Amino acid sequence: MGAFDPLVTYEKGTYIETDTGNKVSRKAVITGATNIILGGKSIIQSGAVLRGDLRRYTAGQHVVISMGRYCNISEGVVIRPPGKIYKGSFTFYPVRIGDCVTIGQNSVVEAAQIGLGVEIGKDCIIGKFVIIKDLAVILPETVLPEATVVPPMTVWGGNPGQLLDSLPETHQEMVEAKCKGFYSRFRAA
Amino acid sequence: MSVLYHCPHLDESRRPPLPSSYPSSSTSFTPLHSLYFCEECDGVRCNQCVAVEVASYYCPNCLFDVPSANVRGDRNKCNRSCYACPQCATALQIQPTEKMENDQMISGAPYSLICTGCRWSSKTIGWEFDKATGIASQLAKLDPGQAAKTEFEAIKDHLETYMSSSNPEPIRTSSKVPTRHISHLTQMAAKALHRDVPGLAAAKAKGKVRATAGSRSGGLEKAHTKWDELSDYVAKDAWRGGNDSLGIDQLSEMERPEVAALSKRWCSSWGRSSLSSSVLPDRILLHTKLTKRCPHPSCRHLLIQPDAKSVRFKIKMVALNYLPAVEIGRRRRRQDKGPGSTPMAPEEIEQRQRERRRTKAKAGDEEDEEMDKALERGAVYVYQLAFTNPLYDPIQIRLTQPYPPKDAPPINHHVHIPTQHFTVSALKEAWAYDEDDEDDDLPGLEGASEVPSDEGVSTVGGTLGRRNRISTLGTTSSGLREKRARGETGVEKKANMTKVLLEVEVLPDAKGDVTFDLEVRYTYRADAPAPNKEEPTSKSSPNDELKTFTFWVRLNVGKVA
Ligand SMILES: [Zn+2]
Ligand SMILES: [Zn+2]
Ligand SMILES: [Zn+2]
Ligand SMILES: [Zn+2]
């Protein structure tokens, strides 16, 4: 699949490639990098913002954003951990993102959990503490209110987001092929 | 631009589908990823023809698996704490009340339901709860639908007293069949369904005629069919109550936002207020995971069996793992000498086609184009078709155009397939390709020697008991050389994918979509049926036989400008 998908090129030197094959744009804004874990072969495109600095204010090491393999964070995406007042004080909670997750341009994500193979379209707002289960599809321009739970293999859209459809049994294979394909086509010119 | 695959919907004739000029044929074509494959029948199945059963129920909000025994009692809705906002249908959150106590913020009872989408709160309808869990059971006490539920249960109980016998009297023909003659209806239903239907006790009705009915419709006693014995049902008060006592006059005087939109009310379980301020939240509907079976009456094998706990499938027989994937791309327009605007006589078209078959297009003759650009009349387009092999052994493909039926409507294009026979290499693990990437001569093609292990096969896509389709074919190196000599124009091979050319000539008077079907026949080596069906041997034994499978794809290459 993807036999005719074109190469996606970037100017040489504008992306940093890590030992594990992550490709991170020099123009991405990554704060608190020590609190961010990338699984490998994931792409963070230019203008994306990852707020690893918004950590829980207690002693010790805290993972703020963890991301699996073959993820693609498009241009202008903002990922920040959700926070709320708990027992009288404001606390941030970590964001967990699975393998093969694609987030479209300019989407803002404050989810608590994004399962494997989830596809979020462009210009979405994913509210605080949203849980998106495996292999869900969030259509472009969807707004998911705070604490929405998206069950696996479903399609959501609209504002506020509603469950619109479910996906075929082959969706996992399709998503994995797509994400791995995109990674291999994303190269320096 | 689309490539759709044909499902014969259990038609066993293995005839090609009607061409796209028959609109009815469109219902047999769907994308490859939504099709199933039954190994027992060796056939493609689709969502329209598979037999579907519910495997499990779950709540889409709390994701709790609801035992199927409870589903009916719970009326297909989550019976925990999941409610949808009456205004925007977002799942409601449980919010505690916060208050200051000794300079400390304390949160606790009473709890209310709030919507994070539109800020609706259950306080507006007076719903508050003592506990943060089991909202549904707490609500059962004050649920205003209760009266209607009781009424329904009562009328059901009333009717159920007649549902004892499934052995109604034989039908007697009569010109006057009372519409309320339920045993008669039961019998008709049983006849139509070829099985017993638990019906109303006809025996009780024998020879008895309800006095009221008889006196009202007179003369009925003479009819052969008679009323069932059905005592009067006395309605409770439910129909009188309810808060929807507003008249149409009152409604018409109100502003629009005050009146609840129909879209917010039609999913309600019970007749409820037409005032938007008093529409009540409903429990969230349960979702299902489905088991799918082969629809063939003598087969009924499982094609899909979900796992209640995960997104994996215990059984997943999908066409994606059996049929080569066909994709179309890289469109080029052939630069022809003559202008395409003047209509050509049929002989002329024939002539040009023959010419084209003889002379091969030289490089520089063609110009790349965007795939979604409108097609021009009289132009010739050369596409690439990509075939990706999902099997662990090479396959040989024969690509043809099916013959249209005699009186088929005229077509707006001609299709020419320069390379009708070609091979597609086996699917391998990714690392195995890396070494061959540069190499056009994939060792896999030479390879009768390469036999995949059992594990390698069964782990793919979680498929169980997938039969090996071991193929050695005519793909020895000599066979390959032979093919080279014959000259496969424009054939590109990479890993388990082969790209071939496809020429489409848009006729001068063409309009609308250019759509056509292709017949794909592929040959693979299949195991001879193993004595133990559960465990097909993967060894390429002398019992292996060459098998062919034919399917049809429908290509839409765009619209004529
Ligand atoms: Zn079908
Ligand atoms: Zn079958
Ligand atoms: Zn629930
Ligand atoms: Zn709402």
How would you name each of these model-derived features?
Chain A
Residues 6, 12-15, 58-62, 69, ...:
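Glycine-rich hexapeptide-repeat left-handed beta-helix
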Residues 36, 47-50, 54-56, 65, ...:
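Extracellular beta-helix/beta-solenoid repeat scaffolds
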Residues 1-35, 39-41, 49:
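Extended, small-residue-rich solenoid/repeat segments and analogous flexible loops
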Residues 26, 32, 40, 46, ...:
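Residues on the solvent-exposed faces and adjacent turns
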Residues 22, 41-44, 68-69, 73, ...:
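Well-ordered beta-strand segments characteristic of repetitive beta-sheet solenoids
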Residues 98-101:
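Gram-negative (and chloroplast) outer-membrane scaffold detector with strong preference
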